[in-house]
């Protein structure tokens, strides 16, 4: 219960509430209940436990935590340190999955592209060198700032099929306020590089947030028009306030949330409707418009094949 520890303590009736990642610190829990662990053996990769069979896809996590501290993100609260696995270990994991029949891989890192020359590029070069005919997907938002021609070439050669870039907003002031990890210029450059290397609209998606503190729908509409001009898929994402983040502090100061707030009310599916001051009909219209735009090329291709 790392994010909602107090709420869990007051409402769960649990004997013990643990906060933080379940690593070596887990020994403390056993000690609390009178158990003494003499030794903790090294962890065995789950793929070697005999439980992962006949799956066509596999998740990949090459590191935990994030070197950035965005105002809306809880990554630094969940993982206080940014740590990465050895690239050789990651490549070995991919090869073992591949040998077992897996062809689709999904990266779930919060900062997969950070320091690319020392991490993701060596991984992709090894994949290309091994001749693996695999497909890679990145559902988490990638940092557009790190996408250069060399990286885009490696992503194309290694089989990337799903690319998601994080923009969140086109408002320059809010970009700086929320962490400064990316600018609209960074994103535009990344998209141009990716397209130059052969990636199509349906392979490049960009996350655009709505419901941020103080954000009007006009700003969201401006972001939609910007992304349409770049010819990428648009993924509207609802803001959800998370305890421990900068935006949570802002909302507490403004009296919108507090210690007594029910976690269900902060869910992204309802928060923007309840607390952002938006017209629900206008939000729905935006979503419909984005959906139509996203599938324009699909309908055109389908019409051409008839």
Regions found by a protein language model. Give the residues of each.
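Short, hinge-like loop/turn segments at secondary-structure boundaries
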Residues: 12-15, 34-36, 124, 154-155, ...
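Catalytic cores of alpha/beta
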Residues: 5-12, 150-151, 213-228
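Short catalytic/ligand-binding loop motif for oxyanion handling, primarily in non-cytosolic enzymes
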Residues: 3-9, 25-28, 69, 114-116, ...
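C-terminal accessory regions of radical SAM enzymes
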Residues: 203, 218-306
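Conserved beta-strand positions in the central sheet of alpha/beta enzyme cores
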Residues: 18, 106, 164, 235-236
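Glycine-rich beta-alpha loop elements in corrinoid/cobalamin-binding modules
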Residues: 1-42, 238, 244
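Glycine-enriched alpha-helix->loop->beta-strand junction motifs that scaffold or abut catalytic
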Residues: 13-14, 156-162, 229-233
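Radical SAM [4Fe-4S] cluster-binding motif and immediate context
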Residues: 45-201, 210
């Amino acid at each position: 219960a790392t994010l909602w520890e107090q709420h869990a303590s007051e409402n769960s009736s649990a004997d013990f509430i643990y906060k933080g990642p379940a690593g070596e610190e887990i020994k403390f829990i056993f000690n609390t209940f009178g158990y003494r662990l003499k030794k903790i053996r090294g962890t065995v990769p789950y793929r070697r436990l005999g439980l992962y069979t006949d799956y066509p896809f596999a998740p990949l996590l090459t590191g935990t935590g994030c070197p950035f501290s965005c105002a809306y993100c809880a990554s630094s609260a969940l993982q206080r340190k940014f740590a990465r696995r050895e690239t050789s270990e990651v490549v070995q994991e991919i090869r073992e999955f591949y040998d077992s029949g897996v062809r689709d891989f999904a990266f779930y890192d919060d900062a997969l592209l950070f320091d690319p020359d020392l991490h993701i590029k060596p991984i992709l070069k090894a994949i290309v060198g091994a001749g693996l005919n695999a497909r890679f997907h990145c559902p988490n938002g990638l940092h557009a700032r790190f996408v250069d021609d060399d990286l885009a070439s490696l992503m194309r050669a290694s089989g990337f099929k799903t690319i998601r870039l994080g923009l969140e907003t086109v408002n320059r002031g809010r970009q700086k306020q929320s962490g400064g990890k990316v600018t609209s210029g960074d994103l535009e450059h990344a998209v141009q590089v990716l397209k130059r290397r052969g990636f199509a609209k349906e392979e490049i998606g960009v996350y655009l947030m709505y419901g941020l503190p103080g954000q009007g729908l006009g700003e969201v509409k401006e972001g939609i028009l910007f992304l349409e001009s770049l010819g990428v898929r648009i993924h509207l994402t609802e803001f959800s306030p998370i305890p421990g983040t900068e935006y949570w502090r802002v909302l507490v100061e403004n009296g919108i949330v507090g210690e007594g707030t029910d976690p269900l009310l902060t869910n992204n599916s309802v928060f923007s409707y309840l607390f952002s001051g938006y017209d629900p009909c206008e939000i729905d219209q935006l979503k419909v418009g984005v959906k139509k735009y996203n599938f324009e090329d699909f309908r055109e291709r389908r019409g051409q094949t008839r």
